[in-house]
From Swiss-Prot:
Organism from which the protein derives: Saccharomyces cerevisiae (strain ATCC 204508 / S288c) (Baker's yeast)
Residue segments, region Disordered: 18-91, 109-128
Deletion consequences: Impairs sporulation.
Family affiliation: Belongs to the ZC3H13 family.
Basic and acidic residues compositional bias, start-end: 37-61, 69-91
Name by which UniProt lists this protein: Sporulation-specific with a leucine zipper motif protein 1
Functional description taken from the UniProt entry: Component of the MIS complex, a complex that mediates N6-methyladenosine (m6A) methylation of meiotic mRNAs and is required for initiation of meiosis, progression through the meiotic divisions and sporulation. In the complex, mediates the entry of the MIS complex in nucleolus, where methylation takes place.
Keyword terms, alphabetized: Cytoplasm, Meiosis, Nucleus, Sporulation
Length: 298
């Protein structure tokens, strides 16, 4: 209701019209503003998009953190696994090297080995021209000791054949020093056997085997031959003495070849060799115990 002042001045209430580009169209059917509804819808969409984007970014950050922590946890395991493989490989290589340096079997009498090794160290150096050095002789010694302890039938045969006691002679006799020309095979067996541990050698043959090992005369690379004083210094006497020396050398050499070839066949074929002076039962026992046959040099 208009007051008196308005009635006096004739005041008339009116609306200010905006330009068309700024005018707001009304939706008479819905009784609302179309632009306002659209703006609200856009704001809702933007708000929803922002919320979804935030959730997505949070999820990505969470997954990244989770993956990083998993890698951190798995990294020590991978490093430990690689270290284990590397260490295992190193141990295997070291084991191969140690096996290559070790002997094929262990010496049962370790005290005898230590004593004999100390005795060997105190001995003078071997003569020049030998096929084996000191280290190789030590290896051969332990191998032949094992054969002596485990296979007694060849015990006396080897010791009688290769010990250092040469021909027994009287003090009044004069000697002729003669070098025997051994082959490399004979010298190799001689060197292998002369280093045998004397403390483990039995001087009595096994009674189960009816073999006379003493018929093989002992010898070394240097043989002392007795000079018969009754033989004159004439050419005939020298000839007879030379024939005697040659006969003894040939006899010893043939015995060496007989034994070494027999042992070689046993090592290679593992079959009894009757022509080598070894019985069938003895040959089968010998083939069970590797000795010098295991050496690569032979």
């Amino acid at each position: 209701m208009m007051n008196k002042v308005d009635q006096i001045i004739g005041y008339k209430k009116y609306e200010v019209k905006l330009p068309k580009d700024r005018q707001v169209k009304k939706n008479k059917s819905k009784g609302g503003n179309v632009d306002q509804i659209d703006t609200k819808r856009e704001k809702d969409k933007m708000r929803a998009f922002g919320e979804e984007r935030k959730k997505f970014l949070d999820k990505m950050a969470k997954n990244k953190k989770k993956n990083t922590s998993r890698k951190d946890r798995e990294k020590p395991k991978e490093v430990e696994k690689e270290n284990y493989k590397r260490e295992d490989k190193r141990l295997k290589e070291q084991k191969k090297l140690s096996l290559a340096k070790e002997f094929r079997f262990k010496e049962p009498n370790s005290e005898a080995i230590n004593q004999n090794t100390a005795a060997e160290n105190g001995k003078p150096k071997p003569q020049t021209g030998l096929d084996f050095d000191i280290d190789h002789q030590t290896v051969s010694k332990i191998m032949i000791d094992q054969a002596i302890q485990t296979s007694s039938p060849l015990n006396v045969q080897l010791t009688e054949l290769f010990n250092d006691n040469v021909l027994d002679v009287s003090k009044d006799s004069q000697f002729v020093l003669q070098d025997m020309e051994f082959t490399s095979w004979e010298r190799r067996w001689s060197n292998c056997s002369t280093t045998s541990n004397a403390t483990t050698v039995s001087s009595v043959p096994d009674p189960k085997y009816n073999i006379n090992y003493n018929d093989i005369t002992s010898f070394n690379s240097v043989a002392l031959i007795t000079e018969d004083l009754n033989i004159s210094a004439s050419s005939n006497g020298l000839h007879e003495r030379g024939k005697k020396l040659l006969q003894q050398e040939m006899e010893y050499s043939n015995k060496v070849k007989n034994v070494t070839i027999g042992l070689e066949r046993l090592c290679m074929d593992e079959k009894p060799v009757p022509d080598a002076g070894i019985t069938m039962q003895q040959a089968s026992r010998w083939s069970e115990f590797p000795t010098c046959c295991d050496q690569a040099a032979i």
